[in-house]
């Protein structure tokens, strides 16, 4: 798949095997995966890192195969998932980092462009989440208040 703001192609990766049930060598249960997921989330670990930890440390090939739910669904059912989706949060944190860098290095034109592209991605993602009714219609990204939104 192509990248958004360049002419280059993205990284290719291997496809995961198609499975409908967990493998027989996986001995961990659904309740245990749920408790591990909630414990890791309380420690401040992202959902992608939770999946990698489950895979590497506990031998869980896919949390959805064992529990029947995605990691974000498990977190939403236990009312611990934040209101702003994680990919949008990561982009906002990146934009805040770039703004902080540009406040010190005012002539850095390459990172000015990077900030412009990042904020374009944020606006595009906000529009998508508003259409999908994940975010309310009156929610919008404002760089001045973005840091307060993320720390909440």
Curated annotation (Swiss-Prot):
Q: Name one GO biological process term.
A: translation
Give the start-end ranges of region Disordered: 1-22
Per the record's keyword annotation, is Ribonucleoprotein included, yes or no? yes
- Basic residues bias spans: 1-11
Pfam families hit by this protein: Ribosomal_S13_N (PF08069), Ribosomal_S15 (PF00312)
- Similarity annotation: Belongs to the universal ribosomal protein uS15 family.
On assembly, the entry states: Part of the 30S ribosomal subunit.
Q: What is this protein called?
A: Small ribosomal subunit protein uS15
Organism name = Methanosarcina barkeri (strain Fusaro / DSM 804)
